[in-house]
Curated annotation (Swiss-Prot):
The RING-type zinc finger domain is required for E3 ligase activity. Residues 679-704, 812-1062 form a coiled coil. InterPro entries: E3_ubiquitin-PDZ_ligase, PDZ, PDZ_sf, Znf_RING, Znf_RING/FYVE/PHD, Znf_RING_CS, Znf_TRAF. This is E3 ubiquitin-protein ligase PDZRN3. Its EC number is 2.3.2.27. It catalyses: S-ubiquitinyl-[E2 ubiquitin-conjugating enzyme]-L-cysteine + [acceptor protein]-L-lysine = [E2 ubiquitin-conjugating enzyme]-L-cysteine + N(6)-ubiquitinyl-[acceptor protein]-L-lysine. The gene is Pdzrn3. The lineage of its organism: Eukaryota, Metazoa, Chordata, Craniata, Vertebrata. E3 ubiquitin-protein ligase. Plays an important role in regulating the surface level of MUSK on myotubes. Mediates the ubiquitination of MUSK, promoting its endocytosis and lysosomal degradation. Might contribute to terminal myogenic differentiation. Interacts with NLGN1 and EFNB2. Interacts with UBE2D2 and with MUSK via the first PDZ domain. Pathway: Protein modification; protein ubiquitination. The modification Phosphoserine is found at S426.
Amino acid sequence: MGFELDRFDGEVDPDLKCALCHKVLEDPLTTPCGHVFCAGCVLPWVVQEGSCPSRCRGRLSAKELNHVLPLKRLILKLDIKCAHAARGCGRVVKLQDLPEHLERCDFAPARCRHAGCGQLLLRRDVEAHMRDACDARPVGRCQEGCGLPLTHGEQRAGGHCCARALRAHNGALQARLGALHKALKKEALRAGKREKSLLAQLAAAQLELQMTALRYQKKFTEYSARLDSLSRCVAAPPGGGEETKSLTLVLHRDSGSLGFNIIGGRPCVDNQDGSSSEGIFVSKIVDSGPAAKEGGLQIHDRIIEVNGKDLSRATHDQAVEAFKTAKEPIVVQVLRRTPRTKMFTPASESQLVDTGTQTDITFEHIMALTKISSPSPPVLGPYLLPEEHPSSHEYYDPNDYMGDIHQDMDREELELEEVGLYRMNSQDKLGLTVCYRTDDEDDIGIYISEIDPNSIAAKDGRIREGDRIIQINGIEVQNREEAVALLTSEENKNFSLLIARPELQLDEGWMDDDRNDFLDDLHMDMLEEQHHQAMQFTASVLQQKKHEEDGGTTDTATILSNQHEKDSGVGRTDESTRNDESSEQENNGEDATASSNPLAGQRKLTCSQDTLGSGDLPFSNESFISADCTDVDYLGIPEDECERFRELLELKCQVQSTSPYSLYYPSSPLDAAGKGDPESVDKELELLNEELRSIELECLSIVRAHKMQQLKEQYRESWMLHHSGFRNYNTSVDVRRHELSDITELPEKSDKDSSSAYNTGESCRSTPLTLEISPDNSLRRVAEGSSEGATANMEAYRPSPKNLLAITEDPEVSTPNYNPGAKELDPSQALEIKERRVSDGSRSPTASPKLGSAYLPSYHHSPYKHAHIPAHAQHYQSYMHLIQQKSAVEYAQSQMSLVSMCKDLNSSNSAEPRMEWKVKIRSDGTRYITKRPVRDRLLRERALKIREERSGLTTDDDAMSEMKMGRYWSKEERKQHLVKAKEQRRRREFMMQSRLDCLKEQQASDDRKEMNILELSHKKMMKKRNKKIFDNWMTIQELLTHGTKSPDGTRVYNSFLSVTTV
C-alpha cells in the first residue's frame, strides 16, 4: 500500500501515484506493458487475476514484474511529516530518513513497564510516570511474612492480603512455566522435523553415491581386466618369469551356452596393421558351465582358433560370431601362460662374496657341519648329480674376479612380478595363506606360505609358496593389518599383487627327489674326512716335535700381524679398523711368503660361492705320516692307537684309489657297495664308528697331556725371561704347544633357534654361511700345531677387501722363514696372545678361516656334495641354521665328555700372572712389545658370560634371521608362541606386582628414610627391566651393583650385560 497524500509537504507529481490505491507509490513495480503500481497492490492482483490491472494484455505472472529503482529513489527524496503528527510531533523529514526518526520520536506511544499498570503514554512521559505517578511502582517489601514486594497503590490502601498475593504470584509462575513447556515442545517438534529431513537427504546422497560407485567399479573392473591382459600380452618382455604353451580343448554347448565371456579383439575390421597384437581373451567363466569343467578354459587364456578358423587377429564381433556359428564339437585352440621353471644359472652369475663375522664355533657347530663340505679344486666332473642338472662351475683368476666384486654386490637379488587375480563375487576365495611375524619388530614381511590347489591363485599359476607380497592394489603393505584388510575386502573383485622372490629360486621337487641320496653319500664321505683330519693332526704333531729338535725360529712380526688387537668381547666393529691397523704389514708378509716359496705360488686357488661361500684350501700331496717320527708318547697317545689310525688310513686310500678323481673327490662307500659285496660296506661302517670313538679318546689324551705340558712350559718361560730377556731363541715350540688350548671352548645349547643375536656392532667381514670348521677341533689344532712356516704364511689367507679369494699357503714344514730384523716373541707373550685368540674362539673375523685351513686337503670341500641345498637357499641364514641344527643333534651326545673337559681347562687357565705382554703398533706401522696389567677377574668372567650368551650368532645372523628372511611357522607353532608369550606376560605382571608390594611395605615401614644413590638407581633399573636396552644415564657401576637383583636381594631378573673393551 502507498503513502497517504496529506502526509507529504507540498504537491505530489501525479506520475508518482499508484493507479490502484491512488496513493504515493511505495516500492514501485512495473509490468511488461509499462504500468507502475505499488508492490503491495499489484502482487495480490497478479496472483489472483493473472493479468495487468490496466487490462492491456493477456496473461501475466509475478515473475514478470520488475523493480523501478530510479523512481523509488525519487520518491524517497520527498519530504513527509512524522507519523505521530496527530500526537504533537511537528517534524518534517525525508522519506528515506523516516524510519530512523520514528525509532527515537518522543511522541511515539509507549506503555508503562511496571507489572499491573499497562497505561499507554508518550515515550517522553514514560520515565516520569514510572517514577512518580504509577500506582504499580514498588515501594518496599511486605513485613507481614510473605516477603512479596508492596506497590504504591497497596501501601496507600493500607496493606495487602499475603495469602491472596502468594496465590496470585504462584499462579503467575505456573502460567509462565506452562508457556515455557509449550514453547519447548514446539521447538522439539521443529527440531525433529528438521532432523528427519536432513537424515532423508543424507540417505538419498549416500544411495546415489553407492550407485555411482558401483557403476564406476564395474567399469573399472572391466577396464582393469582388459588392460592387464593387454599389458601382459603386448608389453610384457619374453621370458619374464612365464612361458606360453598351446592347448587344444573340446567344448560342448549346455542349453545353448558355452559358459564363458571374452574380451579384446582388433579395434576395427579395416585395421590390417600387422603390428597390432590385440587378441581374444577369456575374461569370465561361469561356474558349473561347460568351460569350467576339468580340462576346460581358464581366465586369461588367449583364443587362437575355433574349429580351424583363425581368431588371432579377429575383431570382437567376429570372435562372437565364430562361436555362435561353430558346430559341435567345438575345438578351441588357446595359448595359456604357465610359470617358467627355474633352472641352474652359470656359476659366474651366482658367485658372490658377502662379508660378515663368525662367532663362537663350538663342538656342536663343528660336528653339525661335518655334513657340509667346502668348494672343490678346479677339477670339474659330475659327482653325485643327476643328468638334468649339469655341474658347470667356472673358476677365474682372483684379480679378475675382484675387479667386478662391487658390481656383483650391487646386483638386485630379487625379481618382482605383478599378478592380477579376479573373482566373480565376494564369496570366492583367493586361496592364499600368508604368514608374518608376531613380535614387536618394525620390519614385518608378508609371505605366502600356502596356496589352495583349487583356488583362483592356483589356477592363475604365477604365485608360488614363499613369495613376499610387496603391494596390494597399488598400496604398499606395511604391516599384517593392512594386508589382511586388503585381501579380505569384500568390495574388491580385482586384486593386483606385486610379489618378490629370489632370482635363483629353484623348484623344490628336484631337492626333494635327490635329498636322501645326497645325505647318504655325504654322511659316508664325512666319516672318512674325520679320519683323514685326525690322522693329519697326529702327523703334524709328530712332525712338529721333530722340527723342534732340529731348531728353528719364527718370524714373530708375521705371527703377530693378526694378533695385535685386544679382545673386546665383540670383535672388530668396522672393516676400516682392520684395514687401518694391519694392511701394510700383512701385504708385505704375503709378498715375502709367496716369493720365498715357489710351491705356494703354484697352489693359489680361488673360492666358489655356490656352496656356502667357503674358501678353497691348499692341497699338498706330501704324506703326513712319517715313519721317522715314532715318538707318539709326546702327548700321551698310545702307540697302538697311532698304528690303528695308520691302518685305517691305508684302508681308505685303497678304497679311494679306484676312482679317477681320487685326488680330489673321495669315493663314496655307497658307490663301492653298488660294485662289490654289501657286507664290505657294513664292515667299513663299523670301522668308521670305531674311528669316531678313537678320535674322542685321542682328544681326551691331548687335553691331559696339554695340562702337564703347560705347567712345564710356564716354569721354563719364566726362567728364560729372567735370564735372556728378548734375545732370539726358538719360540715356535711354545707357540704351537699353547695353541692346543683351543679345546677350551664352551658348549653351546642345541636349541638355539632364535632369529637374532646381540646387536653389539660386530664386524661384517665374512659370509654368515661361511663356516670354515671341521668335524672336531682337531682341525684347528692341525693349523696351529703345524710348523712355523705354514703359520707365518697363514697371513695370506686373512680376508681383505682387495684379496678375498686368493689363498697363498706354504705347506712345506722343512724350511722355516727367519727374519733377523724382526723382534722375537717371548713365550709368555705368545701364550697370552694364543690364549686371547682361543678365548675369543671363532668370534674373531679371521680365526675360523685361518685356524681351519692349514693342512686340510682341498678335496674335502667338494661343492657337489651340497647339491641337495638349492643355490638360492645358501643366501638364507635361517635355512642353513636349520640344517646345522638337524646335524648337530646327531653328534651332541658324543661331545658331552669333551665339553666337560673344556670346563676344567677353562678353570685351570684362570690363574694367570698379574702382568702380561702386549703388542702395540707405532704411527709408522712397526710393532713393539710392552708390559700391561692383566684385566681384572671380574672383566674376564663377564667376557666368558658374554661368550656363552652370544652362542655363535652375530649381527649378520640378526640381519638375515629366520623371521626377516621368511621362515614359515605352522599354525601349531604360532599357537605355542602365543601361549609362551602369555605365560611370560603373566610372569612379568606377577613379578611387577610382587615388587610393587615389596616397595610399598618398605616405604610404609621407613617413610622418613632418605634414599641414597643406590636405591634411586635401583628404582630406575626396575622401571627398565623389561626393556632390552638401557637409557643414556645408566652406568656400568649400577649394572654391576644391582642390575640383576630383586628388592629382596635374590637374583630374579635375567638382564643381559654386554661390555665392549676399547
